[in-house]
Amino acid sequence: DTGNSYKGLCDLIHQKTGGDDGIYFTYKENDPISFNPFFTEDYQYDIEKRDSIKTLILTLWKREDEPPRRSEEVALSNAVSLYIEKIRKNRKIKPNFNSFYDFVRKDYRKVLADKNVREKDFDVDGFLNVLEPYYKNGEYGYLLNSDKELDLLNKRFIVFELDVVKDNPILFPVVTIIIMETFINKMRRLQGIRKMILIEEA
């Protein structure tokens, strides 16, 4: 939505459900929009979930006019798979972009060295440098590291307010991917339940 048309309804649902539903995403200067695309309550990471994480990282890593090479896509896919494997085994690791970044910087760097992956095939230092603004205290460190541990799968009413972010070249693509991943996840996993996606004033 744009224009806060659903703010009142969303607040009412949030209040009536004791905060369990009526989830409102918007951007404010003192409370910027944030997500955690790596978090799931049940640690289920199906094909769509993994692909959405890879697409999200690719969007932040590469410009529109800079398509990734096949070797880079494979390296990223392996990094995501190995990271998911690690957080499934060690539930003390908090799934978010920060821990993924740390994993690539330390563990995955060793994997690449052991496999003799050449820098021209996957430049891990360049990868980390480009994504550093989304890590911890970086300019966009808030964006993919939400501490709310919110799994949107079973939330029945979610509003994404795009007024402030629709012209932002960094935030808008991320929010769009999150919206599509949320809806696809509901379509695939919530069998026998009617779903609706409403695009208002698009």
Which sequence ranges carry the predicted segments?
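Glycine-rich phosphate-binding P-loop
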Residues: T2
